[in-house]
């Protein structure tokens, strides 16, 4: 029973993982969560794989040491860099990631088998999505790195002609490839979904991993009998803690736009320099 009452740990390089946190809150409203946005070290996209792995595992170490019952890597770049290491390192704590849920949804959604994937430089270069799609029959995958998208989202700029022009430039190869399904391979990108849809056209289905990741987490917690019991006392509500390794005020201003009243302040935490074990 004590494990059932433990919180769920979630982390991302910044605010992008809040799209995953929002879906988890919606689907698992009774669960306590601890979210860490690594704004002091992020964005992760331009970093090397060893740097991404070190930052990610340092945060994972911290969350697991605090007794989380599950760890959600709410970042495509981190998932592509350290998923295998994290699962070995933190076993028996289950680790849920964002790539496979998005792949499954895209395969189910496509009509012509031509699927686009956009992500950070590190995610696209890792080949993680290409590998994940390899088992899918009758699909052709086209990838494009969109490195500047994260910078705009982290600055709170999610609309305007400048961002639309950037999106049109990035996405032109995918339009020429006639993809009918586009995976938003970074948890920041759903915050630009309106612009991305406008650039791609209404006939293209956008796939975000947030809701599918929350479903995966629900499945894992159910299988391991780790779901938190619904409280008998209606005054007992879930505890949701949000932390940032960078400026907590800047993080709060951005996060409040996506979480609203769910967000009750952001705690500053020390910057994680790297994994030690």
Swiss-Prot record:
Residues that coordinate or bind substrate: 12-13, 44-45, 76-77, 187-188
Entry GO MF terms: glutamate racemase activity
Active site: 75 (proton donor/acceptor), 186 (proton donor/acceptor)
Protein's UniProt keywords contain Isomerase: yes
Reaction(s) the record says it catalyses: L-glutamate = D-glutamate
Metabolic or biological pathway: Cell wall biogenesis; peptidoglycan biosynthesis
Catalytic activity, EC: 5.1.1.3
Disulphide bonds in the chain: none
PROSITE patterns: ASP_GLU_RACEMASE_1, ASP_GLU_RACEMASE_2
Keywords on record: Cell shape, Cell wall biogenesis/degradation, Isomerase, Peptidoglycan synthesis
Top-rank taxon, per record: Bacteria
Gene Ontology biological process terms from the UniProt entry: cell wall organization; peptidoglycan biosynthetic process; regulation of cell shape
Signal peptide span: none
UniProt cross-references to InterPro entries, sorted A to Z: Asp/Glu/hydantoin_racemase, Asp/Glu_race, Asp/Glu_racemase_AS_1, Asp/Glu_racemase_AS_2, Glu_race
Protein's UniProt keywords contain Zinc-finger: no
Primary role: Provides the (R)-glutamate required for cell wall biosynthesis.
NCBIfam families hit by this protein: glut_race
Family note: Belongs to the aspartate/glutamate racemases family.
Name used for this protein in its record: Glutamate racemase
């Amino acid at each position: 029973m004590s494990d059932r009452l433990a919180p769920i740990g979630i982390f991302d390089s910044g605010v992008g993982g809040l799209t995953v946190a929002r879906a988890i809150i919606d689907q698992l409203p009774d669960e306590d969560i601890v979210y860490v946005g690594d704004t002091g070290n992020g964005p992760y996209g331009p970093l090397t794989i060893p740097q991404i792995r070190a930052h990610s595992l340092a945060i994972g170490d911290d969350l697991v040491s605090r007794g989380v019952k599950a760890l959600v890597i709410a970042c495509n770049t981190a998932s592509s860099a350290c998923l295998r290491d994290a699962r070995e390192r933190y076993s028996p704590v289950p680790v849920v990631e964002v790539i496979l849920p998005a792949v499954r949804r895209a395969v189910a959604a496509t009509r012509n088998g031509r699927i686009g994937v956009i992500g950070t430089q590190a995610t696209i270069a890792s080949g993680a999505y290409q590998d994940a799609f390899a088992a899918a029959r009758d699909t052709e995958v086209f990838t494009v790195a969109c490195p500047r998208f994260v910078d705009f989202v982290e600055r709170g700029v999610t609309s305007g002609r400048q961002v639309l022009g950037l999106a049109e430039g990035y996405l032109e190869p995918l339009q020429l490839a006639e993809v009918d399904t586009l995976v938003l391979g970074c948890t920041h990108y759903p915050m630009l979904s309106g612009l991305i849809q406008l650039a791609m056209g209404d006939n293209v289905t956008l796939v975000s991993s947030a809701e599918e990741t929350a479903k995966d987490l629900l499945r894992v917690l159910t299988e391991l009998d780790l779901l938190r019991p619904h409280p008998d006392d209606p005054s007992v509500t879930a505890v949701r803690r949000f932390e940032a390794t960078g400026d907590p005020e800047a993080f709060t201003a951005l996060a409040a736009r996506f979480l609203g009243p769910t967000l009750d302040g952001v705690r500053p935490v020390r910057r994680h320099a790297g994994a030690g074990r």
